[in-house]
Amino acid sequence: MSKKYIVTWDMLQIYARELAQKLLPVNQWKGIIAVSRGGLIPSALLARELNIRFVDTICVSSYDHNRLRDLKILKYAAGNSSQIIIVDDLVDTGGTGKIIRNLYPKAKFVTIFAKPMGKLLVDEYIIDIPQKVWIEQPWDMGVTYQSPLVRDL
């Protein structure tokens, strides 16, 4: 993927607030399940905006910075309920989204960004992104991409 969509911290906060508005009224929600790692920061922003205190994680491994790899569930979260919001940063090819839908069919599944191959899997999202565009999230960047201190072996 040669084209990139650069997301700044400011943009992410604005988009998360827009997503939170779509999730009102808040009394319909009991908690949030973040899809780790991409959904961690959007989940924190939504939890703040909606004043939700219960936040859990499902840990899914699918990317190595910009390379898709086999999906693995590292940790499950309890909570298949229509009162739970599942949050990820994006839906891309739909691999993770299909797993989320199968595990939590009653939950509300939301993302900030959606690409064409996966967007039918989410209930709400904010920004359409073309399939061949790579999204650079602010937690992955300094001035340029910074490798994590610890990498997969």
From Swiss-Prot:
Assembly and binders: Homotetramer.
SUPFAM superfamilies: PRTase-like
CDD domains reported in the protein's UniProt record: PRTases_typeI (cd06223)
Organism: Buchnera aphidicola subsp. Baizongia pistaciae (strain Bp)
InterPro entries, sorted: PRibTrfase_dom, PRTase-like, Xanthine_Guanine_PRibTrfase
Residues annotated to bind 5-phospho-alpha-D-ribose 1-diphosphate: R37, G38, R69, D88, D89, L90, V91, D92, T93, G94, G95, T96
Intracellular or extracellular location(s): Cell membrane
The protein's name: Xanthine-guanine phosphoribosyltransferase
